[in-house]
Amino acid sequence: MIETYNQPSPRSAATGLPVRMKIFMYLLTIFLITQMIGSALFAVYLHRRLDKIEDERNLHEDFVFMKTIQRCNTGERSLSLLDCEEIKSQFEGFVKDIMLNKEEKKKENSFEMQKVLQWAEKGYYTMSNNLVTLENGKQLTVKRQGLYYIYAQVTFCSNREASSQAPFIASLCLKSPGRFERILLRAANTHSSTKPCGQQSIHLGGVFELQPGASVFVNVTDPSQVSHGTGFTSFGLLKL
C-alpha cells in the first residue's frame, strides 16, 4: 500500500529586513536634510547677530569718544593733558574731513546753478546718428561704449558793469545712466570793459571713456553773453 506524503512547503524568505532598512534610510535622509537646513539658518542668524553686535560696539565706542571729549572740555582730572590733546586732535581731524567732503560735494553740484547751453544742427554739423544723437537740443548722447574726444568752444561778450565782475565759467559735464551728473572739465575767463563787447573764447577738450547712454553737455554762468555766430561757439565729440 502506498501512502501519500505531503511535504510542507518551504517558508518564504523574510521580507521584514529590507523594509526596515528602507524606512531607516528614509528617516536618515530626512534627518540629514533637516540638519543641513537648520545649520544654514543658524549660520545666517549668527552672521546677522555678529553684524548687529559690531554696530552696537561701534556706537558704544563713538559714545565713549564723545563723553571723553566732554570730560576734556570740563577739565576733569581723571584724564591727562596729553590724552585730551590727542583726543581733541582726532576730533578736529574728523570734523575737517567732514567739511572737506561737504565742500567737494558743493563744488560738484555747483554746476546745477548754471544754465545748459542750447545747440542746433547747423554750420559744420557732422554727427552720425548711428553713434551720437542730440537730445532736447542740449546734450549729446552716445550709443556705443569707447573712448571719445570731447571738445567745446564758448565765445562770450566780456563787457560787464563794474558791479558784476564775476568770471565767466564754462563747464563740460557728464551724465551717466544710473549715476549723478559730474563735471569733466571747467574753465573760467575774466570780463573786460575796455570794449563795448570784447569777444573772448573758452576752450575745453579731453579724452574720456563713455558708456552707452551717457550724455555730455555744456553749462555756462550766463547764456545771454554767449555769441552764437558760426564758428564762435561749438560743441561735439569724436570716437577714437
Curated annotation (Swiss-Prot):
InterPro entries: CD40L (IPR003263), TNF_CS (IPR021184), TNF_dom (IPR006052), Tumour_necrosis_fac-like_dom (IPR008983)
Keywords in alphabetical order: Cell membrane, Cytokine, Disulfide bond, Glycoprotein, Membrane, Secreted, Signal-anchor, Transmembrane, Transmembrane helix
Segments in the Cytoplasmic topological domain: 1-22
Record-marked site positions (Cleavage): 112-113
Transmembrane region(s): 23-43
PROSITE patterns given in the database record: THD_1 (PS00251), THD_2 (PS50049)
Post-translational modification: The soluble form derives from the membrane form by proteolytic processing.
THD domain mapped to chain residues: 94-240
Signal sequence annotation: none
Membrane-related topology note: Single-pass type II membrane protein
Residue ranges that the UniProt entry lists as topological domain Extracellular: 44-240
Keyword presence, Ion transport: no
GO CC annotation terms, alphabetical: cell surface; extracellular space; plasma membrane
Quaternary structure, from the entry: Homotrimer. Interacts with CD28. CD40 ligand, soluble form: Exists as either a monomer or a homotrimer. Forms a ternary complex between CD40 and integrins for CD40-CD40LG signaling.
Purpose of the protein: Cytokine that acts as a ligand to CD40/TNFRSF5. Costimulates T-cell proliferation and cytokine production. Its cross-linking on T-cells generates a costimulatory signal which enhances the production of IL4 and IL10 in conjunction with the TCR/CD3 ligation and CD28 costimulation. Induces the activation of NF-kappa-B. Induces the activation of kinases MAPK8 and PAK2 in T-cells. Mediates B-cell proliferation in the absence of co-stimulus as well as IgE production in the presence of IL4. Involved in immunoglobulin class switching.
Name of the protein this chain belongs to: CD40 ligand
Encoding gene per record: CD40LG
